[in-house]
Amino acid sequence: MIIIDIMVKDAGWNDEKMLYNITEKALTTAMHHVSLENVVSEISLLFTDDEHMAKINAQWRGKNKSTNVLSFPAFPIKAGNPPGPMLGDIIIARETVVLEAEKQGKTFQDHLTHMIVHGILHLLGYDHETDDEAHQMEKLEREILQKLSIKDPYIELSINDKI
């Protein structure tokens, strides 16, 4: 069981119950898919706005702009290994996710679910720094999202639009 802690720092995220339900479903599906469904841990999600996200992105990545999702693992972990007592933190910027969903012709909830799955995989040690890592992570995302009845998010994206 994983405890989910949700914080909202933007009035635009007006349905905290929906955020929790999407997070719980994405987390349960992702953990089961990577055979970590019996892990006992905790995850924290902050749903914020672009302005706040830009500050965090500048502080931690040196990029003075917003981004869709940032993940901060509580402990270093090798992909496939079980996490410690605290999985980590995921931060999601509402305006960026809304804009990307519109631009890519996706529903907001489907794109938000994708961002949550993407963040969870980062917390579990997966990355996309190399081509091999990116292919592995995208494959997992596709498989998890398919289990959630969400279309392949990469099928129509150009290389410049990818996360």
Curated annotation (Swiss-Prot):
Provide the cofactor list for this protein.
Answer: Zn(2+)
Keywords from the named record: Cytoplasm, Endonuclease, Hydrolase, Metal-binding, Nuclease, Ribosome biogenesis, rRNA processing, Zinc
UniProt-recorded name of the protein: Endoribonuclease YbeY
GO cellular component annotations, sorted alphabetically?
cytoplasm
For this chain, the family text in UniProt reads: Belongs to the endoribonuclease YbeY family.
HAMAP family hit by this protein: Endoribonucl_YbeY (MF_00009)
From the UniProt record, which GO molecular function terms apply?
metalloendopeptidase activity; RNA endonuclease activity; zinc ion binding
Query: Quick one: where is this thing mainly located?
Result: cytoplasm
Indicate where this protein resides in the cell: Cytoplasm
Looking at the keywords, is Transferase present?
A: no
Q: What does this protein do?
A: Single strand-specific metallo-endoribonuclease involved in late-stage 70S ribosome quality control and in maturation of the 3' terminus of the 16S rRNA.
GO BP field: rRNA processing
Per the UniProt record, one Pfam family is YbeY
User: Could you tell me which InterPro entries the record lists for this protein?
Assistant: MetalPrtase_cat_dom_sf_prd, YbeY, YbeY_CS
**What organism is listed for this UniProt entry?**
Bartonella tribocorum (strain CIP 105476 / IBS 506)
Could you say which EC number(s) this protein's record lists? 3.1.-.-
Any transmembrane segments, and where? Answer: none
Which amino acid positions bind Zn(2+), per UniProt?
Answer: 118, 122, 128
Co-factor binding details: Binds 1 zinc ion.
| Family annotation (NCBIfam families) | rRNA maturation RNase YbeY
